[in-house]
Amino acid sequence: MSKKFIELGDPVTQDEKDYEDYVGVGFAHQVPTMKRRKLTEHGNTTESKEDPEEPKSRDVFVSSQSSDESQEDSAENPEIAKEVSENCENLTETLKISNIESLDNVTERSEHTLDNHKSTEPMEEDVNNKSNIDVAINSDEDDELVLEENNKEMRDGEQVQQDLFADDQELIEYPGIMKDTTTQLDITDSEVETAQKMEMIEETEADSTFVGEDSKNQRQSGTTSDEVDADSQINLATKTVRTSSSSFLSTVSTCEAPAKGRARMYQKELEKHVIAFTEGNLTLQPDLNKVDPDRNYRYCTIPNFPASQGKLREDNRYGPKIVLPQRWREFDSRGRRRDSYFYFKRKLDGYLKCYKTTGYFMFVGLLHNMWEFDPDITYKLPALEMYYKEMSELVGREEVLEKFARVARIAKTAEDILPERIYRLVGDVESATLSHKQCAALVARMFFARPDSPFSFCRILSSDKSICVEKLKFLFTYFDKMSMDPPDGAVSFRLTKMDKDTFNEEWKDKKLRSLPEVEFFDEMLIEDTALCTQVDFANEHLGGGVLNHGSVQEEIRFLMCPEMMVGMLLCEKMKQLEAISIVGAYVFSSYTGYGHTLKWAELQPNHSRQNTNEFRDRFGRLRVETIAIDAILFKGSKLDCQTEQLNKANIIREMKKASIGFMSQGPKFTNIPIVTGWWGCGAFNGDKPLKFIIQVIAAGVADRPLHFCSFGEPELAAKCKKIIERMKQKDVTLGMLFSMINNTGLPHKHFEFYVFDRISTYLSSSEDVESSKSSPSVSRA
């Protein structure tokens, strides 16, 4: 049967002709040994009414053109092909010696990026983030629109995930590909020359790397010199404090720059955080020197540290699966051979050999093969097609095809750089630490994961919604960076939990404490910060709707830092007394808008602060923690939601959840802030005053300062500040405040400031304040 294209229009484009030639004689007609599934056609695609004009190619990467020429020459002359193959083998071995974990062995290095071809209109930091704040103010409707979709997708995904790990099925998640070091025909002399030049530049500019990155960001984004000067002061302060805290303070006091806006405001905060980390000799958990290696697994190599040797584990036949399925390996965790292994290996190798000449539909064909779609039907991928057309006009067709190939190359590294076993955070397994490159390999495999996996990118690629095109921009920017200039370091994923009795003991010891220090920031956003704990307003399923249509706070964080998606592979659905900590995630992109108006943006200085290499700890992790805590979803009218939230069991549950997350780093972080905002108050319909008070109590239990970002609601923030000041004047303790919100009573009609009004009533009566000192127990939930 001849292959037919679904809703691709007529007449046939050159790309389609190339693909027809490819599938007629090439790898696409090879049938895998396993039984193929026949899927129905996607119903959400739109028909193309006319043949889209193929964008003209641009000379974006000179080395790409030379590679094409060398491929054509080698195809005509077998002797040249043999010589190229031998040269590629030698080059591959040389690159492996210089950097064993390098992901870009077969990727050209170039200073050109996608952002060089974006609009030259300046994007100032304050303008971008002011836009984010303005949109976020009225984002509740956007949240609600995507919430219903996400909840259904999460429920379906949870059931699918249970099915995937069933004992009577083969573990399904990632197709298996093995790296082939014998035929790397897409390496050219120009790529070798470029790589050598880059190595020389890295050696000569090692002492000025971060300053150079700031200059590059300034040129690309049009950021004002004042903002860059402020970030330069932060960098200078960081380097100085590593030598001496006293010399750091003197340097800062004599280095006044005309910084403006949030850059200047946050500069002082960051200086205090640097001092706290340095003088306190603080290490974010897990401290790999002190934790039990049999529960805290380190899968990457860290200089000057011995190899990690955790105990070998086997899947429990009747419990949750602990070994992460790795379909890129020839054998599964039980030693059984995977029949699909060599089939997928041939597909990926075949694509990388001829992707430059066969076009867009070659990549579509690869995805169809990996997903095991019906070989006689090509299902349309609207989001991918729209991305291809849009980006071809901006950077050229050849560069977009190179972006696709980079994903495939990174996916090929999985078998080489990942261990044979990666354990999920279930049972007594507490944490997993992987390198940035290992994380990239896992995320790249999600591109090729079968559609029935809850961790597949298929739902993004096959959507016809514009938000999914923006998500692809985030993802391909991530893979571009990891291919051409990957950061060196590690990321830790940790499940933090506490049983009910232990928490009750903690509460008894801490309920007599005074309220914590609370600072308010009207313009600063959570993602503007560094050297702190950033709160992720999470779904109980980590990542929420990031792999679907979700585009609110948690999804945006995961798009800015795609390696956070590895946590989705490692973590089960969060339980009531659990939180998930991610330490060291690198930021790859910025954004504008919120919800359905979300847009990708090149990385801005305010978001790149936490990427500073000087902020890395001795394990190579960036000193920033993202703590994921999920709130309760309330439904109904505003009055119904407010009444339900004032139920004592719900107050106790939310207080425990926030406290466990805020206590994740232990007792030594008393000067390191928790940066948060209106947690659970968007699509989850949380009462903002109540959620603010609950987080104040949780920060007090953790004995850490609270930095509260009001997201453009200064009036509400002013009321929060006023109520905190009044309570401090009355010497209100954590236990007294907890008692107040547990005895507010129920409102007769919805009033936004009902909780504050009731607290003010208590504060007006000293008798009520004294009587509330006998705080209730929190053990009822």
From Swiss-Prot:
For this entry, list what GO says about its biological process: ATP generation from poly-ADP-D-ribose; carbohydrate metabolic process; DNA damage response; nucleotide-sugar metabolic process; regulation of DNA repair; response to gamma radiation
InterPro entries referenced in this protein's UniProt entry, alphabetically: PARG_cat_C, PARG_helical, Poly_GlycHdrlase
What PANTHER family does the annotation carry? Answer: POLY ADP-RIBOSE GLYCOHYDROLASE, POLY(ADP-RIBOSE) GLYCOHYDROLASE
Please give the catalytic activity noted in the UniProt record: [(1''->2')-ADP-alpha-D-ribose](n) + H2O = [(1''->2')-ADP-alpha-D-ribose](n-1) + ADP-D-ribose
Result of changing residue 594 to A: Reduced poly(ADP-ribose) glycohydrolase activity in vitro
Which species does this protein come from? Caenorhabditis elegans
Question: What name is this protein filed under?
Answer: Poly(ADP-ribose) glycohydrolase 1
Q: Where is this region: Disordered?
A: 28-87, 102-131, 206-232
